[in-house]
Amino acid sequence: MEVNVSTVIFNWINFGLIILILKHFFWDKIKGIIEERQNLVNQTISKADEDAEKARMYLVKNEQILQSAKEEGKKITEAQRAKGDKLYEEIVQNAKVEANSVKERANLEIEREKEKAEYEIKKQAVDLAVELSVKALEQQVDEATHRKLIGDFIAKVGM
């Protein structure tokens, strides 16, 4: 294979002319498209960085809100627990007061029944004494009979 110098020079000249023609008519357009694409890529990267920063800020803000909500929930829980404890204490106190009231009423009722029973016993004692007196007046009572009547009276009274 032989290399013809004139063909090589001619090819180099053609290549240079094609480059000059392409540069003259298309290089600015291609360069503009490339710069436009580079700007778009840079804007997209910038936007992605901004979005990532916003996302980090939202994440921090959401974590703060979550922490605040947890603290608020804890405060509410503690307040409700304290309220429940207070209500429990009030219920227990009211129950104690009611129990004491019932106990007091029962004691008063027992005291009334005791007084009523004592009154009935006294009434029966008086009735028995009257009956004994009537029997004593009906009979001539000697000391032995008198003792027997008193013993019967005591037995009836339950002393």
From Swiss-Prot:
One Pfam family named in its UniProt record: ATP-synt_B
Q: What is the annotated role of this protein in its UniProt record?
A: F(1)F(0) ATP synthase produces ATP from ADP in the presence of a proton or sodium gradient. F-type ATPases consist of two structural domains, F(1) containing the extramembraneous catalytic core and F(0) containing the membrane proton channel, linked together by a central stalk and a peripheral stalk. During catalysis, ATP synthesis in the catalytic domain of F(1) is coupled via a rotary mechanism of the central stalk subunits to proton translocation.
Q: Which UniProt keywords apply?
A: ATP synthesis, Cell membrane, CF(0), Hydrogen ion transport, Ion transport, Membrane, Transmembrane, Transmembrane helix, Transport
Q: Where would you find this protein in the cell?
A: Cell membrane
* Segments crossing the lipid bilayer: 7-27
- This chain is encoded by the gene named atpF
**Subunit info?**
F-type ATPases have 2 components, F(1) - the catalytic core - and F(0) - the membrane proton channel. F(1) has five subunits: alpha(3), beta(3), gamma(1), delta(1), epsilon(1). F(0) has three main subunits: a(1), b(2) and c(10-14). The alpha and beta chains form an alternating ring which encloses part of the gamma chain. F(1) is attached to F(0) by a central stalk formed by the gamma and epsilon chains, while a peripheral stalk is formed by the delta and b chains.
Q: What is this protein called?
A: ATP synthase subunit b
For this chain, the family text in UniProt reads: Belongs to the ATPase B chain family.
What membrane topology does the annotation report for this chain? Single-pass membrane protein
- Entry coiled-coil feature ranges: none
Recorded GO CC terms: plasma membrane; proton-transporting ATP synthase complex
Alphabetically, the GO molecular function entries are: proton-transporting ATP synthase activity, rotational mechanism; proton-transporting ATPase activity, rotational mechanism
